[in-house]
């Protein structure tokens, strides 16, 4: 049995559970994996990126039992001192991470209509983990809480007041755990004091969002009440004129639910290219001269640059533009194209720095002469969740020093 405490981080999706085990002293990852096919006929568990192993068809508790078995095989099960759960939506009830209690569970349930697929999955994971680890303190970390510092003028829609007052219709933002982690690392990398800083962070993956961070606090973000607003993404449309959607509905007799599905699952890079939602596929097609792949990438880049520029207006100063997420960390092409469109800020990209692989880790990619610095910082949401669990669980470690 290991002689040191570990933190188990759990991220329950609608059909999967991603998990990581981190050393509570250093927050280094000791084990990670994913259970897929929750509540499906075929379920699998893969560890550390290895080959998936078939599991008996099972729900969240069965999948967590399989994960617990994997921990036991590695003498980690008895070392689990804290469990951190990623929860997609905290509404306006949760402004920070919290220790899970019955009241917290009830409040999560209360706001779950805002993100039914993800929140109810998280609630199932929490209930299962509580049964499997009854003596372990558990913490909820919300994807929306970092953005609860937005001012009303930044989170309100231009809709009748009653929709906000009676239904809670407003902008909440997402990717908050990633934006919070990356903004902290950016301050260290750029040598900036938190209370005198202005950053724009571009979290670019299959889901993508921009966040303006002023003096360590989120002051604007591109996603809204749902993750559909903002940037064009892998399969999501991003910002679309509602009038255009109403016109399409009238012409095609599609329902609101039909169009929501189209905007979420058949649009974005996939919709324009007609080829793929995977940027790696589209980049290959770009180099092969595929016209619609090139158009999809150009549209993607245009939206990113426009949102970065717009979010800079929420800052009192612009110290850095930071790329993160799977695309932001790995795509030399996207970073170059976005940076070219931000020349108005005096941003100059260093070609050699930009071409460094992500294995280099945190790195500056702007030229020395650039008026605004630009960096790549690999996100680590699991580490951020573990740090929150450690802080709330009052385990004093070197990772918090």
Swiss-Prot record:
A GO MF label: acetate kinase activity
Organism superkingdom: Bacteria
Keyword Nucleotide-binding: yes
Active site: 143
Keywords tagged on the record: ATP-binding, Kinase, Magnesium, Metal-binding, Nucleotide-binding, Transferase
Gene Ontology CC terms, in alphabetical order: cytosol
Database matches in Pfam families: Acetate_kinase (PF00871)
Site (Transition state stabilizer): 175, 236
Cofactor: Mg(2+)
Group of enzyme by EC: transferase
InterPro entries: Ac/propionate_kinase, Aliphatic_acid_kin_short-chain, Aliphatic_acid_kinase_CS, ATPase_NBD, Propionate_kinase
Binding site for substrate: 86
Catalytic activity as recorded in UniProt: propanoate + ATP = propanoyl phosphate + ADP
Ligand binding (ATP): 11, 18, 175, 203-207, 278-280, 326-330
Keyword Magnesium: yes
Residues the entry annotates as binding Mg(2+): 11
Subunit and partners: Homodimer.
Function: Catalyzes the conversion of propionyl phosphate and ADP to propionate and ATP.
PANTHER family recorded: ACETATE KINASE (PTHR21060), PROPIONATE KINASE (PTHR21060:SF17)
Name of the protein this chain belongs to: Propionate kinase
Originating organism: Klebsiella pneumoniae (strain 342)
């Amino acid at each position: 049995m290991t002689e040191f405490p570990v933190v188990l981080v759990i991220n329950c999706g609608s059909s999967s559970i991603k998990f990581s085990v981190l050393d509570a002293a250093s927050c280094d990852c000791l084990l990670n994996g994913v259970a897929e096919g929750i509540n499906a006929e075929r379920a699998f568990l893969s560890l550390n990126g290895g080959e998936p192993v078939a599991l008996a068809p099972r729900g969240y508790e069965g999948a967590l039992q399989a994960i617990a078995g994997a921990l036991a095989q590695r003498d980690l099960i008895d070392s689990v001192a804290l469990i951190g759960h990623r929860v997609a939506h905290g509404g306006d009830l949760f402004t920070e991470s919290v220790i899970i209690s019955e009241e917290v569970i009830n409040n999560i349930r209360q706001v779950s209509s805002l993100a039914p697929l993800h929140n109810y999955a998280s609630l199932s994971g929490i209930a299962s983990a509580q049964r499997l680890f009854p003596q372990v303190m558990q913490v909820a970390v919300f994807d929306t809480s970092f953005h609860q510092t937005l001012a009303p003028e930044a989170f309100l829609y231009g809709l009748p007041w009653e929709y906000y007052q009676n239904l809670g219709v407003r902008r909440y933002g997402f990717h908050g755990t990633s934006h919070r982690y990356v903004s902290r690392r950016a301050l260290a990398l750029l040598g900036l004091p938190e209370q005198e800083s202005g950053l724009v962070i571009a979290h670019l993956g299959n889901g993508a969002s921009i966040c303006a961070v002023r003096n360590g606090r989120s002051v604007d973000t591109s996603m809204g009440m749902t993750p559909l607003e903002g940037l064009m993404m892998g399969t999501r449309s991003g910002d679309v004129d509602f009038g255009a959607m109403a016109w399409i509905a009238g012409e095609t007799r599609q329902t609101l639910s039909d169009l929501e599905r189209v905007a979420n699952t058949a649009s974005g890079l996939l919709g324009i290219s007609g080829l793929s939602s995977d940027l790696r596929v589209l980049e290959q097609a770009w180099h092969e001269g595929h016209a619609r792949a090139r158009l999809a990438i150009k549209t993607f880049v245009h939206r990113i640059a426009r949102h970065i520029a717009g979010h800079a207006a929420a800052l009192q100063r612009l110290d850095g533009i930071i790329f993160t997420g799977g695309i932001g960390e790995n795509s030399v092409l996207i970073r170059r194209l976005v940076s070219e469109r931000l020349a108005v800020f005096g941003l100059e990209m260093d070609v050699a720095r930009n071409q460094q692989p992500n294995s280099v880790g945190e790195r500056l990619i702007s030229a020395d002469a650039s008026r605004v610095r630009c960096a790549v910082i690999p996100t680590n949401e699991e580490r951020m969740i573990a740090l929150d669990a450690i802080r709330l669980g009052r385990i004093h470690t070197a990772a918090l020093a």
